[in-house]
Every structure is written in C-alpha cells, then in structure tokens.
C-alpha cells in the first residue's frame, strides 16, 4: 500500500506521488499574529506536523514552509487598542507562537516568511496579473478580476453566477463601487490615514491577505508545489483566491494536493476567536494539561473530522497518555537494570526507517502502523498500534515501579527491549515523546490514584486475556463503585473517566 491522501481539489482520496522523486514541497497557511493561538490552531499544526514527520520517516526530503501574516486589519486594531504598533503586536505574538508550538513538539518549518518581508515579490506578482488583464487598479486599490479566471470556484465548488444572483440585495459601499464584479477581491489596498503603508506603482498602501500567500509560495517553493495545507475554514475564500491569483499568473497548477483539517467544536459550534468560545494553548498547558496529552487528544480523531472539545475527552486523553508514557519511560528508567543495550537518544527529525527493525515478531505491528498512516493519515489507527506495543511494557513498568523483580528469561527481556525501541520510534513519527512525571499529569490529576487505576486496568486486561471474565467483570464493577467508568475501544485500548 502507498500513501493515499484526501485531495480537496478532486474530492477523492488518491495515491500521493511527489512531483520530484524523493522530495516533497509543502506550504502551510500560518497564523495572523494578533493574539495567542488557541486549540484550533494546535489541532491544525499537530496534524500537519504528523504529515511532515511521516513523509520524512518514509524517506522523503521534505521542504516545509509556513508563513506569518504580520500586517492585517486585526493586527492594526489590536495595536490601536493597546496604543502600540503593528510591529510590536506582531513580534510579541510571533514569539508566543514559537513557544506554544515548541511546547507541543511541533517541528519548526524550514522557512517562515513574513508578509512584510516579501513585499517585492507581492508587488511583482500583482504587476504580472495586471499586465495579463487579470487585475485592475481603481483609486489606489488593485483588484483581481474573478470573471477573467475560468477556473474560479474549482476548489470550493462555488458557482459565481449563482452567487451573483444571491447577492442582488447587497448594500453598495465605496469599495463595491470601485469593483467591476461584486466578488473581485483586493490585491493591494490604498493607504489609510494613520495606518502603516508601503510604496508601490499604484501608490502607497499594503497587500491584501490572499496575494501574500501566493507570492510566498512562489518565492519559497516555485510555481507548483506538492501539498498545500490549511484548515477547512480557509477553502473559501482564501485558498480559492490563492489558486486564482497564482494560476492566472503562471498558467500552472498551484498545488497538486490540497489538504484541509476539520474544526474543533465547543458545544456544537466551531471554536473561534470571533465567537469568543476559544481556549488558548497557553491556558490549557497552564491548567495542568501536559503537551503530550494535548497532542494525543488531537490525534485520537481523524484530521478531516470535527473534534469535540470537552473536559471528559481531555481527561480520557490524559489517562491514555499516562499509560503510554509509562511504557515509553521504561527504557530510560529501567533499561540498565534490565541489561538492555544502550540506545541513542532519538533526534527530533532523525526518524528510524522501517527497514531498521528486523525483529520478525514486531513486523506485523509496524506494518499495521504503516497501513494506518498510508490510509489518509489514520492517526487513531496508528495510536492503536502504539497502545498494543505498550501493553506488556506498561505491565513490566508497573511491576518495576512497585519494586518487584523482572523475573523473565533473557530472550524475553531482549524481545521487550526491541518492542520498546519500536514503540519509541513509532511514537516519534506521531511527535509523541516521553514526559517526566511532573509534565505528564492531566487536569486535576492525582498521580498515586491514577497509578492504582491503571494497575487495576492492567489486571483486568490480563484477566480477559486469560479468559477469566468473572475477574475482569469484578475489577470493572469495583472501579465503577469508585466512580471510575471504563471505556473499551477498538485495538484493545481501555480508557477511563470519572463520573
């Protein structure tokens, strides 16, 4: 099986074949830096970090570019509210973005261009569009003429003629009067009094949002790239407009694959700053949620599906991570006493290729992991493999933590060492790393109590494996009486929540 990805452009799940053998070029739409990032941003960038890591692990040379929008109406408003400057607001939030992403283990992009640093390329691209008749100037503004681009709407499936009919009752404004068509959009905005501006052939002003990404893709990666990434809320108008601008200028396809992640929902509504129902990454981490718990919470759902944010779901993720973290820590905490061979620390990007694991009994598990990831990045299926790998390791870790001896044959301990190494390597593909106990606690965590609960769950799993269902039911009922409800999931995963 080869990697198959769902392409928003074709509305199909297709085999991924890079434009250049052995290489992959990826552009990810970044944040507008006027505020701290929320959980919706974390979801997007964790998902795309996993895509990048998996491509690297699969042997591709990946160039990953993600931009910053550092000039925008929202930034200017924030600067005005704070009696600050556009630059001060942008720099503060860029620093905060890096801190948040680093805490979540998200690899830094190879390049992170800023709109204000790419003005020459932006102006040049606008000039090309104007020379080709795809753009026109009006009173210092420059607009893209959507009716001049025959393919407009191919990403979102929108029909301009239908939209024009539905827009018949719109109230005209000054900008509308300058446009040749209601859905033409700004490439360059004339300067307004009191706002930062930059020189251009059309007069002082600043770029529109959509043209920034088109110019940065071209400057960093060329006219056609392998994969373009973003949230589902960017399909229209942002990505639709990107395609129109870039393809009108170059005559070539902008990206062969367009991928979009689903939204995070709170109470049935999309999490967003405009609705005021957002939770920042920083607030979550400061509340006691560990970075890897948050990462596991995101990866339990498929990247294209909505993700419901609830306290119960977050607590369940904390429970799952605690068991996985115990297994990941086995080699570091007890490897020497188990006489396991020393293994080098895994570098963030130096991921181990599949062929480096010759151990025959583990190959089916590794293949299950690969099959899941090849199936449009089925991260929940990949996590199920990690939990399967972790089961005997976690049981051994629990015994050793209680001071028990690891009385097992040498060949069995050697097999467990290989199992642990594979767990660590595959976890790294998902960006999951072992956390110290102080990091890995969840919201309202009582470490001793959680250890006891996990030990009971392990005993129940062992009882079920031995077909001692009466004992398994007894353990379940005993936990239920303590307000602990067990949730058995596919792949042999057992999670728990407090009632």
From Swiss-Prot:
It catalyses: tRNA(Cys) + L-cysteine + ATP = L-cysteinyl-tRNA(Cys) + AMP + diphosphate. One of its GO terms (biological process) is cysteinyl-tRNA aminoacylation. A motif ('KMSKS' region) lies at residues 270-274. One of its GO terms (cellular component) is cytosol. Its EC number is 6.1.1.16. A motif ('HIGH' region) lies at residues 31-41. GO terms for molecular function: ATP binding; cysteine-tRNA ligase activity; zinc ion binding. ATP binds at residue 273. Keywords: Aminoacyl-tRNA synthetase, ATP-binding, Cytoplasm, Ligase, Metal-binding, Nucleotide-binding, Protein biosynthesis, Zinc. It comes from the Bacteria. Binds 1 zinc ion per subunit. Its cofactor is Zn(2+). It is found in: Cytoplasm. Zn(2+) binds at residues 29, 213, 238, 242. Monomer. Belongs to the class-I aminoacyl-tRNA synthetase family. HAMAP family: Cys_tRNA_synth (MF_00041). This is Cysteine--tRNA ligase. It comes from Synechococcus sp. (strain CC9902).
